[in-house]
């Protein structure tokens, strides 16, 4: 329970950081007249992704560490039912939490920005909504990936290292590949699926991705599907 408060609290820190960032760039804009700054809901998204991915990992690894998994299996003997229930709870909780945090960050930053030209506040909410929903889905996908890896590895440290590698290490390493392989591989990496779902450029360096929105969404769903399948069979075959 304590870890849940900590992880959700860390994710919610995005709102505070978003307010601080918007105030900072607003002051700069008042001095310079105009400024193009990164949107806080995009810049601080990795904080939410990592925090709630930790929650997904701990949902299963904490029970293995404390032995509570045996109690859970006594209450719910069917491992498929137990794992499906955990998957559903993590999915609903993380999507609701992430979407709420993203929307609150979005609204507060635009209210603070006012009429200032900061770059990120020049588009309408309806234009930004696909990216916000895609960001929320990415958080849920990472949390479910964490759950699947945690079930497969039964190690908090191992699962977290894998999540961090997927979220930060691999995207960073791909940037150093020669073109066009950097863009081709980056197109399939989880963090780069968000702009493709929203029909946006991945980055100025990588350019446009190769996936249409529906295909990017399918790849995003494939990440948790694969890891959850592996985690389920690991839970089913190994002794608690």
Regions found by a protein language model. Name each.
Residues 219-240:
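Junction motif at the cytosolic side of a transmembrane helix
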Residues 5-6, 68, 81, 158-159, ...:
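Residue-level recognition of membrane-helix boundary sites in multi-pass small-molecule transporters
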Residues 156-193:
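Transmembrane helix segments
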Residues 34, 56-75, 79-80, 87:
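Transmembrane helix boundary and interhelical loop/hinge segments in multi-pass membrane proteins
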Residues 1-5, 77-79, 154-156:
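Short loop-to-helix capping motifs
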Residues 28-32, 64, 68, 108, ...:
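Membrane-interfacial segments
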